[in-house]
């Protein structure tokens, strides 16, 4: 209690130069991408992670240790409705400033 909370949503991503930085109300935490990758790989979409510093530990540069620790401590199934978004047609998003783009389409076989 009394500790700032930063939601891991795209609107809170403020930097991606040397790692992903999440910021909110003047508070920021960096190198969250390895922890986020572990959560995604394990199908976890709702959790609270407490960080005691300005960044997530980089460890070996992968999500492996995060996955191992999450599996070690376990997870709790929540009794809540989960929203799903189904993309029915091809979508392309392009950021003209960075030149990056995201294209969603059919699965490749």
Role assignments for model-derived ranges:
Residues 1-109:
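Short acidic-hydrophobic catalytic motif
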